[in-house]
């Protein structure tokens, strides 16, 4: 039996990977086998094993079953820009069937699969399609990550509205403090709790570096039915 969820954010650079790591670590501590999946990544760096995406590397590090890099990230685009632009620059096509095959592979090998998106909910993967179109097709429940900063309320409201308009369920959300100097942090979180009306899975404090950190204590996985 596998449970799978999709992690999206209110924008790029709001902490989707940090939140994904925290959820995966918490689920693993609860005794489940866990796999992380970054179906589409834009932006790579050279490693001894070839080009890789740093977010996908972190998800692989939190994965508790044996996987290759391409198992975690089947579609790697090298330019650090919107996936549809990167794909055009590199003469590539984001193939939804490839993404689905990769998801099924991980679902068959783990009890819990966490899929991390690229950018926000409406990030385009071609000029006519978005990654959300694939998520809707896969019927993946959504975890929303809010990067708590000035302006995040509008971003969170609009993102939640778009997800629900697409017929998808938001099962929980995570507050990630991306700016330690954000004023009225508590009031912002309180407002989000009131408006989103779904369980808050946790709050992640500002962290300059997350390498080798155990983030599981910041997340409550009970709302995920585990």
Range-by-range predicted roles:
Residues 4, 18-93, 102-105:
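N-terminal phosphate/diphosphate-binding loop that engages ATP/GTP or pyrophosphate donors
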Residues 80-125, 132:
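Phosphate-binding/switch loop-helix module in NTP-utilizing enzymes
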Residues 126-149:
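Inter-motif core of Ras-like GTPase G domains
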Residues 160-226:
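C-terminal lobe/tail of nucleotide-utilizing enzymes
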């Amino acid at each position: 039996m596998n449970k799978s969820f999709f992690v999206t954010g209110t924008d790029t650079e709001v902490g989707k990977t940090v939140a994904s790591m925290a959820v995966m670590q918490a689920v693993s501590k609860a005794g489940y086998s866990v796999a992380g999946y970054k179906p589409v990544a834009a932006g790579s760096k050279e490693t001894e094993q070839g080009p890789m995406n740093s977010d996908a590397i972190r998800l692989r590090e939190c994965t508790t079953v044996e996987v290759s890099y391409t198992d975690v990230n089947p579609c790697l685009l090298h330019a650090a820009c919107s996936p549809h632009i990167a794909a055009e620059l590199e003469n590539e096509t984001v193939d939804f069937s490839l993404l689905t095959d990769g998801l099924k592979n991980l679902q068959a090998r783990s009890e819990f699969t966490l899929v991390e998106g690229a950018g926000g909910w409406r990030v385009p993967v071609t000029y006519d399609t978005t990654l959300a179109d694939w998520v809707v097709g896969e019927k993946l429940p959504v975890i929303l990550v809010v990067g708590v900063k000035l302006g995040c309320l509008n971003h969170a409201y609009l993102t939640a509205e778009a997800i629900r308009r697409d017929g998808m369920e938001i099962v929980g959300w995570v507050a990630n403090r991306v700016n330690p100097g954000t004023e009225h942090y508590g009031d912002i979180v309180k407002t989000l709790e009131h408006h989103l009306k779904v369980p808050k899975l946790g709050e992640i404090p500002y962290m300059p570096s997350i390498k080798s950190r155990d983030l599981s204590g910041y997340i409550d996985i009970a709302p995920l039915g585990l």
